[in-house]
């Protein structure tokens, strides 16, 4: 029996990749609460300079990830997804270790760019599971996997803040590197993949990848949907704390209230993603996607009219429950419309669009709030999501008509 004939325990792989995504999500978000403080510690002074450098070191990771993702996706389709998971986890661990040793802002900026270049654990985990899980369970599996990164990202800022308070800023980078190395070890020992390497000559070129897709126009619309989902999420991030302060008035625990309101969508997504993924396996992920987008629009609009932080918290919880279905539904539709041979590249292209959304979303939110106020951000974001819902519905309708 050849290695490629050995049956894969995809359920165990799902469990281990979930742990890997949890650790990666936690590791990335561990350093986020004090990133501006570390920039200041590296010698940047002055309000405008601090804001500029903080924005640069935050966004450059996503920019370089967007550039590098297609390359790593192609390599994953040639060499296998497990080796890409190992490369990502070990590479990020080394970079995080070096970040804790940075002596000036330029070194730190270069390392943040390198982090983006070497990242990609979560999209490769998605590609691995998507190619191993039975098709009729794709929605549930990818929905479950998405909760790993979300739960890690929820826990990370809290743990990072506590660790920074007790041990200082630099040790948190060393702790984060250790977490990523644990992720590397888990992947090395417990994830199994039957993959026959493909020579460079046998690899499909970009045109052949597009030609092999069942519906290239639909796949492109799914990439755009991913971008807009991240734009909608990111547009609110820069103004959330300030908006909560405007609603709450003069209170002493504004940081706690803001942190809670920032985290409730993630908690809701944890609860909803596997359930809605399973529902999508029954009724179709395209229905879940369109309904979740429409619900998001209906929840974003009243956010601009709330009068108390608790009204905002309730609406954001409901929004998180709807949002928990969006990316898994997109990923499931990508699985349905591509082959295992090109899964690495398709998921990496999707990651590039996601990274672009991560950069443009906060910029859009900051620009709108500066010109028209905090409340306008929610209305404009609702308009963007409504456009996405109409665009996605039209793309899916064309696909259905083409099949008929």
From Swiss-Prot:
| GO cellular-component term (any) | plasma membrane
Record-annotated membrane-spanning stretches: 19-39, 56-76, 90-110, 113-133, 144-164, 171-191, 222-242, 254-274, 288-308, 317-337, 376-396
Q: How does it sit in the membrane?
A: Multi-pass membrane protein
Keyword Cell membrane recorded:
yes
Cellular compartment(s): Cell inner membrane
Q: Which Pfam families match?
A: MFS_1 (PF07690), Sugar_tr (PF00083)
Listed A to Z, the keywords are:
Cell inner membrane, Cell membrane, Membrane, Transmembrane, Transmembrane helix, Transport
Determine if Transmembrane helix is one of this entry's keywords: yes
InterPro entries documented for this protein: MFS, MFS_dom, MFS_MdtG_subfamily, MFS_sugar_transport-like, MFS_trans_sf, Mutidrug-R_MdtG, Tet-R_TetA/multi-R_MdtG-like
| PROSITE patterns noted in UniProt | MFS (PS50850)
This protein's name:
Multidrug resistance protein MdtG
Q: Report the gene name.
A: mdtG
């Amino acid at each position: 029996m050849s290695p490629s004939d050995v049956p894969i325990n995809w359920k165990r792989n799902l469990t281990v990749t979930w742990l890997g995504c949890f650790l990666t999500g936690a590791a990335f978000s561990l350093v986020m609460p004090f990133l501006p403080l570390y920039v200041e510690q590296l010698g940047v002074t002055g309000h405008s300079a601090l804001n500029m450098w903080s924005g640069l070191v935050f966004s450059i990771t996503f920019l370089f990830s967007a550039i590098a993702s297609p390359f790593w996706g192609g390599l994953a389709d040639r060499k296998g997804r497990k080796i890409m998971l190992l490369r990502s986890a070990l590479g990020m661990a080394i970079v995080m270790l070096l970040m804790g040793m940075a002596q000036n802002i330029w070194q730190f900026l270069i390392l943040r760019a390198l982090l983006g270049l070497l990242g990609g654990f979560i999209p490769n985990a998605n590609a691995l599971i998507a190619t191993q899980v039975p098709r009729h369970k794709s929605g549930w599996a990818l929905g479950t996997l998405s909760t790993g990164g979300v739960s890690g990202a929820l826990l990370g800022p809290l743990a990072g803040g506590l660790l920074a308070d007790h041990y200082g800023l630099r040790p948190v980078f060393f702790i984060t590197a250790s977490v990523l190395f644990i992720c590397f070890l888990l992947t090395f020992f417990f994830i199994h993949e039957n993959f026959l390497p493909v020579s460079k000559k046998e690899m499909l070129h970009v045109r052949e990848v597009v030609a092999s897709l069942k519906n290239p126009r639909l796949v492109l619309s799914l990439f755009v949907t991913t971008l807009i989902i991240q734009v909608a999420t990111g547009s609110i991030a820069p103004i959330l704390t300030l908006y909560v302060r405007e609603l709450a008035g003069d209170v002493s625990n504004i940081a706690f209230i803001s942190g809670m309101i920032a985290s409730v969508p993630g908690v809701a997504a944890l609860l909803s993603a596997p359930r809605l993924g399973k529902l999508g396996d029954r009724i179709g992920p395209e229905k879940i996607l369109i309904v979740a987008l429409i619900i998001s629009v209906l929840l974003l609009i009243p956010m601009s009219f709330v009068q108390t932080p608790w009204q905002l918290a309730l609406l954001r919880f409901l929004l998180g429950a709807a949002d928990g279905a969006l990316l898994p539904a997109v990923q499931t539709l990508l699985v349905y419309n591509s082959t295992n041979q090109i899964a690495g590249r398709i998921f990496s292209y999707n990651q590039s669009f996601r990274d672009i959304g991560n950069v443009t979303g906060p910029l859009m939110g900051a620009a709108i709030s500066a010109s028209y106020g905090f409340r306008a951000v929610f209305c404009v974001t609702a308009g963007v999501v409504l456009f996405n819902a109409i665009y996605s519905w039209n793309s899916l309708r064309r696909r259905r008509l083409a099949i008929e």
